[in-house]
Amino acid sequence: MGSRFVRWRGVCASRRTACTARKGGALVARFAHITALVSWSSHTACKPVRTTIPEILGTQENASHGATEAGGRFQPHFRGPPQQHQLNPACEIGGTPTFVEVDDVFISRTPNRSADHDDSTNVTQAGRPDITNPQLKTLHIEIDGTWIDGNVAPPLWPDKLGTRLDVQGFVFWDPAHVDTDWHQHSGWELHPVAAWRYSAR
């Protein structure tokens, strides 16, 4: 067995029982701070799970090439009208997290304020040329009117297409829009969105 010297200089010979060594220099290392994900919204204490739009949607396609409900990563999830306008969504369902963070997405549809006060848009995952079907990297997202009326909502969406964002919200399936073109022929949404920020990327 031998000895391994780190940042020392010297000479050792296999026939000698002793080694000469001298210090060769200081060893310097830089470590990034370990930061846990936290909610950016003061309204929810849920801890987000970092994911991507393609992970939320999965790879299973329906006849219109939209993402299927069964193929999504987050099973089970919020679903349908009874869970559509929650002011205080649960942080998990059956052990599956409901609250997620999606980073580096860009606005790909002009924001729209609907009759139920929801402020909605579509976002597309940046930097994924490997996914050729745009419906598998684009997601409908909504700031819920219940949150807006309750004064706990984030700011409304920026109007400029292509704006890069990081978004936190709750995974939701809306069965009313699985045949809708502007909804990517899929029910997947982030709804309600709890917070967003401009992406640093």
Residue map of PLM features:
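OB-fold and OB-like single-stranded nucleic-acid-recognition modules
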Residues: G2-R201
